[in-house]
Amino acid sequence: MAQAALECPACRQNPRSHSFEHLATLASDGTRIFYTAPALTEEAESPAKLENMRIHLTNARSTPWIWVLDCSNMESKHTSSMEFVYGIAKTITAEHEGILRHIVILNGNLWIRCAVAALRLFVRADLVKKLVFADYILDDLRAIELTDVEIRAILRRHYALSSPV
């Protein structure tokens, strides 16, 4: 029997607290693709932020998955503390080792690149190997064996966020 999804208390109050949405499921093996865009979030840095994000990660844990982190339009107000980033890395390492296939970073800005460089010193190499900076988006997404339909779903979401309103 499948476990019911946990509800994030921050998202219950404000659906824009976090950005962690299920985009697609790979037809080939059931791997789910989740999308995060920090520029779309409204939750401020707080002690509860890590616990709330862990709820979303727990809900992703039922099948293999890929996490797309889109850094488009990120400003300083969207960055997180290294404590938060390290907490997410520890959670992924402890609870998602066999099921998180890749973390695809779109438009990796300087802060994200520095955070990843710092994390390399403190997390296991197998987590670092899962990071894909998609500077050449199509090539990188095809390299992790996504179909064109799945790539289009990611790009549609990405360009909707990147395009001026």
Task: Tell me the role of every PLM-derived stretch.
Residues 1-165:
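Basic, amphipathic alpha-helical/coil surface patches used to engage anionic, phosphate-bearing ligands
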